[in-house]
């Protein structure tokens, strides 16, 4: 399949531009660093101006920036593992924890893993970019500043005060 890149106001467009030149350079640097250190670009990596096709990297290791920092672009790395325990260890070996995904046919095992993954959001058999406006959004560790969205924002931005009035009895 193909994901249309362009103007997000058009219905056939799935990918818009990277938000700024600074962020575009960060995404490019992460991809280039991984390639220069031996990672393989399985798909994507092409650019049209400030737009990057979704990029999947394999052969990524801890020496690569894309493994140790948040990229905030359409880039992901696939890490093969031999067991759920190894997957959990790899997932939690980071100072960041915004979002994670578990892909498996064993939903019971996925739910157990999801409880142990150090991330603010864990998606099972779904991409990490999914969010819902009625659910608090945020990460753990060095990802984010707590939670935002719905009642969380109201509580954060409000100082509650309770005022009562006793009316005089006539």
Q: What residue spans do the PLM features occupy?
A:
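Flexible, acidic loop-helix segments that line cofactor/substrate-binding pockets
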Residues: 1-29, 46-52, 68-73, 134-135, ...
């Amino acid at each position: 399949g193909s994901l249309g890149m362009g103007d997000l106001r058009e219905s056939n467009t799935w990918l818009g531009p990277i938000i700024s030149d600074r962020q575009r350079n960060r995404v490019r640097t992460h991809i280039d660093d991984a390639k220069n250190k031996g990672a393989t670009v399985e798909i994507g990596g092409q650019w049209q101006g400030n737009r990057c096709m979704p990029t999947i990297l394999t052969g990524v290791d801890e020496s690569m920036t894309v493994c140790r920092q948040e990229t905030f672009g359409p880039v992901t790395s696939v890490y093969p593992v031999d067991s759920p325990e190894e997957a959990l260890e790899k997932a939690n070996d980071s100072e960041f924890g915004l979002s994670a995904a578990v892909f498996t046919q064993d939903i019971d095992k996925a739910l157990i893993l999801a409880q142990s993954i150090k991330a603010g959001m864990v998606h099972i058999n779904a991409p990490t970019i999914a969010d819902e406006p009625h659910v608090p959004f945020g990460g753990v560790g060095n990802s984010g500043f707590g939670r935002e969205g719905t009642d969380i924002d109201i509580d954060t931005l409000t100082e509650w005060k309770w005022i009562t009035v006793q009316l005089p009895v006539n």
